[in-house]
Regions:
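Viral RNA-dependent RNA polymerase
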Residues: 1-368
Length: 368
């Protein structure tokens, strides 16, 4: 257990926030580990042991968020507005994109519990019904387009959508369903029953974690808030989106000829009958899912994960969220040549690339 925690502790992103309470004294994970490495490692080991030996009978009782905190099962999550350009509509509505990072110790514990499933997801890309780990390089683009075409032959035209406010929709029931889904899908060799038990209990208790703002603790009164900063956030969000997609298909009685490929809150679906998009949207709304930009792919092009794919072009995809990519690059505390090259590579297929390239290299002259 010590070696497992050590391995994942050494993998955390050094420039990310260590979360509460370490963020009271340290600006990032690197600074915290440099000063308190042994103590942090021991805390990770102790907490992982608690999850692996937890008594499932506590699930029959009413969950008390403070009990979880006081008994050391998890730390409070912090919350802040994500540092990125926001659409004007979000500013008008006051609906900013919030991030709720988990503590450094919880990052490591969750990585210990779930990293093998995340790895299995990426190694079985598409086959597992997930696009987590999809590459936007030519090989990844080619694989994705071929997958979309094969699914269209099987189920009919593809649709594209994303879910508004997806991170706030995850009820305890959805967490529980995702745990059972994982148990059925991921039959990872050597995973003992106590790991699955820890997974089940974590899935039941995670929705009751506490949020800290400043020095005040808040209990979540609205069900469904996905924390970020976990090694499992992307995979779990993707699982939730897949479960929601199939539930909508069941309600519409189209599940026998339906499939969905999600990556977080973005998804492509197949099997929605012609002229039934509005029914699909309304059915989703009836279970609290607001679908944005729901439409059929057309003209041989399809949107997915902020990229526009052209079926007749497999050398890359057009990055539609390039302002965010440039902003993220410009706000890095330490800007490396790799960061600039990565942004330029992402924007390579955009029609505005010559102008964007000149701008990027002017403000960040690190690339020949």
């Amino acid at each position: 257990m010590r070696q497992l925690c050590l391995r994942h502790l050494l993998k955390v992103h050094g420039d990310k926030s260590p979360g509460y309470p370490l963020n009271l004294d340290y600006t990032n994970n690197h600074a915290a580990m440099e000063s308190e490495f042994v103590g942090i490692l021991n805390s990770c080991i102790a907490r992982l042991h608690m999850w692996l030996t937890i008594d499932e009978t506590i699930l029959a009782e009413e969950i008390d968020s403070y009990w979880l905190l006081e008994n050391g099962y998890m730390d409070p999550s912090t919350i802040f507005i994500k540092d990125e350009p926001h659409p004007e509509r979000k500013l008008v509505d006051g609906k900013y994109r919030c991030i709720t990072p988990v503590s450094l110790v919880d990052q490591v514990v969750e990585a210990c519990l779930f990293s093998e499933m995340s790895t299995a997801n990426k190694e079985s890309l598409f086959a597992s019904g997930s696009a987590v780990g999809i590459g936007f390089h030519p090989d990844g683009v080619r694989d994705y387009i071929n997958y979309v075409k094969s699914m269209e032959k099987k189920y009919g035209p593809a649709t594209e959508d994303d879910v508004s406010g997806f991170d706030s929709l995850h009820t305890p029931q959805v967490y529980e369903a995702s745990a059972e889904y994982d148990r059925l899908i991921f039959r990872i060799k050597g995973v003992a029953e106590n790991w699955w038990k820890a997974h089940r209990v974590w899935s039941k208790l995670k929705p009751y974690s506490i949020v800290v703002i400043g020095d005040v603790l808040y209990v979540r009164t609205d069900e469904g808030m996905m924390d970020s900063g976990s090694r499992d956030t992307s995979r779990r969000n993707t699982t939730f989106r897949r479960l929601y997609g199939f539930y909508i298909a069941v309600l519409m009685d189209i599940v026998q000829n339906f499939d969905v490929l999600p990556n977080g809150d973005d998804a492509n679906s197949w099997g929605i009958p012609e002229n039934h998009l509005e029914t699909y949207r309304k059915t989703a709304a009836s279970i609290g899912i607001t679908l944005r930009d729901l439409r059929y792919a057309n003209d041989g092009k399809i949107n997915f994960c902020s990229h526009l794919y052209d079926f007749n072009r497999t050398d890359g995809a057009v990055l539609t969220s390039w302002p965010k990519a440039v902003y993220k690059m410009l706000t890095k505390k330490v800007l490396e040549p790799y960061d600039v090259r990565q942004v330029l590579e992402e924007m390579r297929c955009n029609t505005q690339y010559p102008v964007l390239s000149q701008f990027v290299q002017k403000v960040a002259p690190l690339v020949d």
